[in-house]
């Protein structure tokens, strides 16, 4: 049964009979042109479907697939109403019905989209909160230049200047300028003294846990679009603790490179989707957080990130019902509180850590470029993306 009445979006005096209904507000409309005039409401509907899918509900694949399928069929109906089966008198049979109408290949393609973590691409780009202060996203040009020097050469403390330029800057900007700005976060109201948390002096290896924790923090925030949805809180923290060995497994690292590679290995092994940042982008965001707003308050971003982590882990622990999960969240929260106190009293250690992150970022970029060059050369020799079938050089003739 088609919608009753006239289209609500045609010009006055020219309204045509309504053929479709908005999936969000049930407003009647007659064509693709009028649907586009009502696009904001429909876009909100599809965004809600994506968020429901990311929550992992069992029925959500049908909701999102149905929404996308409906949009496709309505567009086809505008040009080929008879072939698409959406002419007057025919309407989709509901979201669950549309999922059943997908072919096996279409269902498999949609499930691959979800399993690879690419459904988030349907959401508006998200902008990190640490880009919303001062002059915006910034990474020291000196840090990137220092990453190209001999690593055995002593490094002076770099001065804070401008953004990167050229291809590296473009690669370092995974978030669009018109992306959704994250809400600003405040510094923790109270930071305990380090001596009150531990009777013995902190290990010199404590500093290397920061890059590992911040890598997981930046990656998880981008993957979960800011992590503000309470329905995704458990998944958010599970990803965070899996990527950060320092938080999830109380792992100790002997260098910044080791700490970053431990987190990167989780993503490269396919245990979690790479998200909008990927390995290289997450390394770059760690350096940005460690650099802070500038020399006057360099530790501000790191303190804010650790405070945000401690608060988020505390909220997740209140929701957790399994004892083992609650204990794991408790230990991770205590680790964040310890790192918070350590950072507050060791601001001078942040610049060397940021320099190490820039080196790791540059090394990862060089490796990726070399692999791309090698792959291109092999494909040129092979004449395609796969090697040719080996030819038989010596064949034994039948006796």
From Swiss-Prot:
PROSITE patterns: ZF_HIT (PS51083). Residues 70-97, 152-175 are annotated as: Disordered. It comes from the Eukaryota. The keyword Zinc applies. A zinc finger (HIT-type) spans 7-41. Zn(2+) 1 binds at residues 7, 10, 30, 34. Residues 86-96 have a biased composition (Gly residues). Low expression in most tissues; highly expressed in testis; particularly in seminiferous tubules. Keywords: Acetylation, Metal-binding, Phosphoprotein, Zinc, Zinc-finger. Zn(2+) 2 binds at residues 22, 25, 38, 41. The modification Phosphothreonine is found at residue 161. The modification N-acetylmethionine is found at residue 1. GO terms for molecular function: zinc ion binding. May act as a bridging factor mediating the interaction between the R2TP/Prefoldin-like (R2TP/PFDL) complex and U5 small nuclear ribonucleoprotein (U5 snRNP). Required for the interaction of R2TP complex subunit RPAP3 and prefoldin-like subunit URI1 with U5 snRNP proteins EFTUD2 and PRPF8. May play a role in regulating the composition of the U5 snRNP complex. Interacts (via HIT-type zinc finger) with RUVBL2 in the presence of ATP or ADP; shows a stronger interaction in the presence of ADP. This is Zinc finger HIT domain-containing protein 2. It comes from Mus musculus. The lineage of its organism: Eukaryota, Metazoa, Chordata, Craniata, Vertebrata. The gene is Znhit2.
């Amino acid at each position: 049964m088609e919608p009753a009445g006239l289209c609500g979006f045609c010009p006055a005096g020219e309204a045509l009979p309504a053929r479709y209904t908005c999936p969000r507000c049930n407003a009647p409309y007659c064509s693709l042109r009028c649907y586009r005039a009502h696009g904001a409401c429909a876009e909100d509907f599809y965004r809600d479907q994506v968020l429901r899918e990311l929550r992992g509900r069992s029925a959500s694949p049908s909701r999102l697939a149905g929404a996308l399928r409906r949009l496709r069929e309505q567009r086809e109906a505008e040009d080929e109403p008879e072939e698409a089966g959406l002419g007057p008198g025919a309407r989709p049979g509901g979201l669950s019905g549309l999922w059943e109408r997908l072919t096996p290949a279409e269902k498999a393609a949609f499930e691959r989209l979800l399993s690879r973590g690419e459904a988030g691409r349907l959401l508006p780009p998200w902008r990190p909160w640490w880009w919303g202060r001062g002059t915006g996203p910034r990474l020291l040009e000196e840090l990137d230049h220092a990453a190209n020097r001999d690593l055995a050469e002593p490094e002076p403390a770099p001065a804070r200047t401008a953004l990167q330029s050229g291809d590296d800057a473009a690669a370092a900007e995974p978030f669009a300028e018109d992306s959704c700005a994250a809400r600003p976060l405040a510094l923790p109201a109270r930071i305990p003294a380090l001596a009150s948390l531990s009777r013995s002096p902190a290990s010199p290896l404590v500093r290397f846990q920061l890059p590992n924790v911040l890598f997981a923090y930046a990656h998880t925030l981008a993957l979960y679009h800011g992590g503000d949805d309470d329905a995704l809180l458990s998944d958010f923290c599970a990803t965070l603790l899996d990527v950060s060995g320092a938080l999830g497994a109380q792992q100790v690292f002997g260098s910044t490179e080791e700490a970053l590679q431990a987190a990167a290995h989780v993503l490269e092994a396919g245990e979690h989707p790479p998200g909008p940042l990927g390995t290289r982008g997450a390394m770059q965001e760690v350096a940005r957080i460690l650099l802070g707003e500038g020399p006057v308050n360099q530790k501000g971003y790191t303190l804010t990130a650790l405070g945000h982590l401690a608060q988020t882990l505390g909220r997740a622990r209140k929701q957790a019902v399994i004892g083992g999960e609650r204990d794991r969240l408790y230990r991770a929260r205590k680790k964040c509180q310890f790192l918070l106190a350590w950072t507050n009293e060791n601001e001078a250690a942040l610049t060397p850590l940021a320099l190490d992150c820039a080196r790791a970022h540059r090394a990862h970029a060089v490796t990726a470029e070399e692999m791309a060059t090698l792959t291109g050369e092999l494909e040129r020799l092979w004449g395609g993306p796969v090697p040719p079938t080996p030819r038989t050089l010596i064949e034994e003739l039948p006796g």
